[in-house]
């Protein structure tokens, strides 16, 4: 079909050009000449375009321009592009430009273009006081990637171009596109013309006719209103954006986007300026943005948009759910099924809390924890003044005199009660050489310290006698010199201080860097906040409430250290006053582990706050590391209470904790099938080793003959398993082994995605089991719990139940994608400032504090009971 025949089909075309239009034609011809100079080999077969031919084309363009200039007074000049004598330039090319003027908004235009036929659509409208936008929707069903259909929209202040097929990446192509032209902001309406023109040029480089349709609409509801939800539809080929202007009395707002569809999309907030970055390929270059499936939210401040007092909200549907769901769903949406990707979205903008509410929430949290200081002070006065805590000071003078006479009348014995027990025992346990040395009890128990015990040549054999007795008492395992043990236990908190400094400082530096990157890039997928309740602190913290809610760990950790220090001071007074008498009564008091527990609680607050500066997949171990340490220290403290001489050294304990943290990191980063199998095997093996260590009180060795000894033990004493020598220890260890083996097998089979939480659950489960066992054994041995301990236990149980309820609300999850995590976001529930996870912080801090207090107060009823009457279990 010839160009003239093609034009004759249309009765809406005008061939009347204005002077300005002919100037544009001149520019367009020059552009075509430039293109022809590069692609002329497709049009002619003899040789390249010569200088003579190029100059001829340029002369032709100048001639057209001069002819139009000679008739400037004429408002309309008729020029037929197809009749231009292009042969003058020796070019085998005819270009026909058709104009469709006075186009109507809302009307669909359908036509064809090819290499020699282009069409210009002209829209004319009057700008009003209200900001409006123009949306252009085009479709070209038979366009190809080799010969796309090109669209160019020109306005007074900018130009926008795109093509069909509309390609996103290398896998997705679309034959329908809807684009919003950058609107003229109402602040500029005084400096621009009221009458606005839009030129939309449609062209193609294909020799065959390419069909297209074009529809242009004015978006009259382009501005979003405050506190009024807006529901609309969009799709992959239809990116959309709206404008919002801050009201005069609003300084901060919450932008909330919701959808029932799980189709992946991006929400972006950008400054009001052209061009608007509304494509999948460029949306990340401007403003703040986050991915979403069912919901998204952004906290925005007016001060961040001072220039225009508002912003654009851009919505872009992604072609696949790979980013949001974590799997790849490749789908090429063609002209027949573009509606398959439609997504219905509701956007709402509402105000946030004021600065006074910020202050009330902060002071309220601090005041709440100060109440614990007041209660602790009152209880301290009651215990000290009313004599509720009976210790050595409460013994009568007659009792003190009897005990001192008993001490002075005792014969010199080696290892305290060992000689007496061996003399009364008729069992010939020791070898003759050992018995001779053993009978020579030349030193009193007071003269024996850590070095004298550990370095005697028969010390190992004597430990075998003591620690393998069927009925053990605390006096049997509290024989090392107190000063040396105290120095050893003090290493726990001093080493922990060093660990905290060297571990904490790089963490602080890293999270500050995270915050700066988040602020500078605007990529809010970096951090897993609860965006529906995320209150920033200027540009320093994006979620200040999640950071500040850790104040409970810090304040209660310090309070626990103060309480321990007070008990330490009182105990030292008793030592100075009663001397050797203290060594006969109560559980041995060593406060090093208690100080370490308080410090660990304090550091948990610091590290959890650091994690919540930018919570994500790479730094979750910041939050859990000191949780592991707290669990380990609590179990060590329970064991130390009645096994003071055989507890783990500080460096050994912390090295074991470091190995645990290392395993946690491996599980998070490399959670493969091989890892889970190896972890399960290691877990079960370590459980067996610790079982033997606890059951035999450390009196066994791992060497090349270990398996031979185990086999002999099974052969000779296998039947005795139904009647174990140490029934209480056997029961605890049996239950512990069952629970730990279940944990290990569950991990290997189910392979939970959150390995760090899984590992933490193992430690909490073991700690809970040990605490329950210890309390039950106290009651079985007729030991009493005073009223304060009962209150603390009940309070701890209640707060732990509440804590776990809020913990499992799953507001966020770093094990999922950012969009998947964001789907669980919920609004604030406390003072319009704190969310469920903040309440977890509050309650878990209280729970840990009361758990520590249980261990501190649990054996106070034994302070006036002789150690040789306190059983070991």
Label the model's feature ranges.
Residues 5, 18-19, 25, 52, ...:
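Ala/Thr-enriched low-complexity intrinsically disordered regions
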Residues 13, 28-30, 78:
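Residues marking helix boundaries in flexible regions
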Residues 11, 20-23, 72:
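Intrinsically disordered, low-complexity polyampholyte segments enriched for Lys and acidic residues
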């Amino acid at each position: 079909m010839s160009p003239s025949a093609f034009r004759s089909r249309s009765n809406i075309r005008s061939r009347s050009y204005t002077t300005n239009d002919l100037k544009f034609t001149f520019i367009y011809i020059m552009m075509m000449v430039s293109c022809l100079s590069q692609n002329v080999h497709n049009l002619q077969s003899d040789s390249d375009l010569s200088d003579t031919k190029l100059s001829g084309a340029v002369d032709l363009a100048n001639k057209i321009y001069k002819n139009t200039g000679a008739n400037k007074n004429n408002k309309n000049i008729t020029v037929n592009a197809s009749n231009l004598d292009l042969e003058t330039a020796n070019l085998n090319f005819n270009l026909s430009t058709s104009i469709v003027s006075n186009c109507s908004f809302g009307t669909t235009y359908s036509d064809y273009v090819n290499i020699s036929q282009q069409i210009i659509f002209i829209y004319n409208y009057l700008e009003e006081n209200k900001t409006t936008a123009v949306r252009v929707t085009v479709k070209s069903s038979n366009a190809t990637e080799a010969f796309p259909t090109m669209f160019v929209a020109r306005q007074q202040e900018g130009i926008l171009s795109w093509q069909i097929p509309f390609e996103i990446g290398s896998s997705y192509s679309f034959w329908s596109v809807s684009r919003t032209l950058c609107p003229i902001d109402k602040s500029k309406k005084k400096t621009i013309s009221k009458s606005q023109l839009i030129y939309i040029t449609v062209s193609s480089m294909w020799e065959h006719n390419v069909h297209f349709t074009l529809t242009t609409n004015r978006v009259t509801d382009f501005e979003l209103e405050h506190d009024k939800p807006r529901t609309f539809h969009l799709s992959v080929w239809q990116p959309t954006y709206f404008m919002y202007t801050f009201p005069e009395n609003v300084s901060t707002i919450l932008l909330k986007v919701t959808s029932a569809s799980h189709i992946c999309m991006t929400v972006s907030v950008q400054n009001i300026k052209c061009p608007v970055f509304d494509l999948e390929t460029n949306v990340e270059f401007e403003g703040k943005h986050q991915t979403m499936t069912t919901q998204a939210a952004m906290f925005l401040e007016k001060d961040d948009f001072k220039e225009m007092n508002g912003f654009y909200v851009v919505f872009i549907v992604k072609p696949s759910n790979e980013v949001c769901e974590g799997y790849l769903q490749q789908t090429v949406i063609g002209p027949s099924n573009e509606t398959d990707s439609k997504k219905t979205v509701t956007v709402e903008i509402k105000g946030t809390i004021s600065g006074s509410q910020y202050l009330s929430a902060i002071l309220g949290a601090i005041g709440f924890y100060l109440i614990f200081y007041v209660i602790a002070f009152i209880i301290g006065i009651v215990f000290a003044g009313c004599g509720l805590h009976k210790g050595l000071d409460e013994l009568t003078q007659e009792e003190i005199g009897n005990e001192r006479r008993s001490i002075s009348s005792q014969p010199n014995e080696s290892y305290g009660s060992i000689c007496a027990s061996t003399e009364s025992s008729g069992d010939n346990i020791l070898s003759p050489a050992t018995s001779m040395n053993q009978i020579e009890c030349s030193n009193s128990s007071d003269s024996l310290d850590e070095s004298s015990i550990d370095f005697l040549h028969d010390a190992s054999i004597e430990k075998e006698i003591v620690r393998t007795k069927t009925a053990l008492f605390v006096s049997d395992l509290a024989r090392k010199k107190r000063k040396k043990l105290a120095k050893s236990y003090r290493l726990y908190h001093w080493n922990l201080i060093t660990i905290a400094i060297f571990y904490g400082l790089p963490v602080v530096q890293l999270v500050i860097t995270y915050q700066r990157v988040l602020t500078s890039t605007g990529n809010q997928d970096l951090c897993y906040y609860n965006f529906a309740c995320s209150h920033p602190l200027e540009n320093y913290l994006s979620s200040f409430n999640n950071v500040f809610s850790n104040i409970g760990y810090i304040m209660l950790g310090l309070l626990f250290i103060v309480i321990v220090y007070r008990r330490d001071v009182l105990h030292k007074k008793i030592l100075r006053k009663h001397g050797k008498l203290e060594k006969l009564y109560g559980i041995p008091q060593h406060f090093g582990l208690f100080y370490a527990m308080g410090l660990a609680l304090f550091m948990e607050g610091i590290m959890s706050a650091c994690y919540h500066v930018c919570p994500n997949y790479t730094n979750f171990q910041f939050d859990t590391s000191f949780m592991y340490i707290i669990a380990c220290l609590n179990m060590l403290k329970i064991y130390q209470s009645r096994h003071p001489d055989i507890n783990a050294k500080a460096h050994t304990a912390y090295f074991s904790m470091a190995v645990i943290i290392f395993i946690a990191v491996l599980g998070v980063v490399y959670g493969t099938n091989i890892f889970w199998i190896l972890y399960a095997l290691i877990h079960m093996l370590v459980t067996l080793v610790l079982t033997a260590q606890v059951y035999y009180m450390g009196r066994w060795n791992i060497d090349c003959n270990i398996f031979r000894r185990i086999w002999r033990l099974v052969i000779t004493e296998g039947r005795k398993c139904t009647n174990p020598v140490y029934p209480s220890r056997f029961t605890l260890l049996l239950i512990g082994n069952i629970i730990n083996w279940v944990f290990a097998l569950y991990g290997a089979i189910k392979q939970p995605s959150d390995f760090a939480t899984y590992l933490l659950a193992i430690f909490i489960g073991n700690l809970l089991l040990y605490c329950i066992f210890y309390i039950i054994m106290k009651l079985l041995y007729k030991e009493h719990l005073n009223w304060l301990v009962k209150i603390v236990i009940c309070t701890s149980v209640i707060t732990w139940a509440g804590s776990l309820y809020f913990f499992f609300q799953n507001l966020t999850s770093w094990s999922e994608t950012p969009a998947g995590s964001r789907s669980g976001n919920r609004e604030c529930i406390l003072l319009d400032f704190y969310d469920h996870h903040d309440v977890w912080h509050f309650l878990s801090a209280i729970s840990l504090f009361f758990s520590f207090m249980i261990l501190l107060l649990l054996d106070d009823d034994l302070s006036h009971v002789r150690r040789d009457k306190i059983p070991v279990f």
